[in-house]
């Protein structure tokens, strides 16, 4: 069986496969594969995590498994997922491992791998690790064990890398920024980057206790940030998710600037416009229309940053992302990076001498409603004839005026129901109707 989903291995801590025992075996299996494919006798892996309490246990287990397989480990501590991708390359490691469940609740956790290039691990290597997991764990001769060391300057290295993506002749001296860290991996480095570039920073949700990650805060819950920006009289707000690979922003009036807005800014307002942009099937139709008017290419990929990355590489483009705030700028970073994405928007603000709301003044999203239907067990909505009939009826109703999208989450038992169209009330009603239909059929199935 394959343990890897669309974004590594993920689940509830204490239940397979997110257990200390499995993490030990996974570390050993990955270590054996890396030893076979590494030009070095003892390959190096960098290992980082977000702020979940369970991350410390999984870190110890993974580290032990890797060392037992003869792999050296550099422990980075709590850092954003893109920081681990960067440090994998910067420290010339053979691979990077992140312990995180991103925007999920604290009781979930996950494990994913980066290649030596700081990109998602190729499917072929994941399959090799799967095969190795079926074998028994055995300890190498003591002389062949690996060892672990803690990297004490990991935060500083990453902060400097982020700052290097912001033009050296620009500064943020005149800006007041509220930064929502989601009690997550960017709780320290996030505010530091913007402060060191000159901004006056108000940091929110930057006191992780291992259990409060993403709890009514961060990019998935921006309401308190929207309120705080107005209360503090700030120029803008920035919200990360738990592992800081997603970002949403807020203008000075408290309006939300999501991933579609950010792509619009980078594609149409920047001094150097990209040849094309990759969105996803979730990207608002307004983005597609706006980019067409600006003579910027646009293609849709499946949901998931690995598919956006794949489409970018196929088209030879560098800019892409999702409405949720996964933004890729491949000329700056190998993976989605919330801090770097925010810095690219700030770069446009400085070079255009415009406020955030001015950059999106001419960009209006079509009404779109997304309903997440959480299930006890995952099901395929298109395998149920009654649901297919409902979907077809909705598509016919919106023909030429909008669209629907029904898809399964790749990381949790959730069916996402998205409806988009030119009439807001119709869109809301239709989305709730379809979500209720999914709930009803799930109870019957």
UniProtKB/Swiss-Prot annotation:
The gene is glmM. GO terms for cellular component: cytosol. CDD domains: GlmM. Activated by phosphorylation. The lineage of its organism: Bacteria, Pseudomonadati, Pseudomonadota, Gammaproteobacteria, Moraxellales. Belongs to the phosphohexose mutase family. The keyword Magnesium applies. Signal peptide: none annotated. This is Phosphoglucosamine mutase.
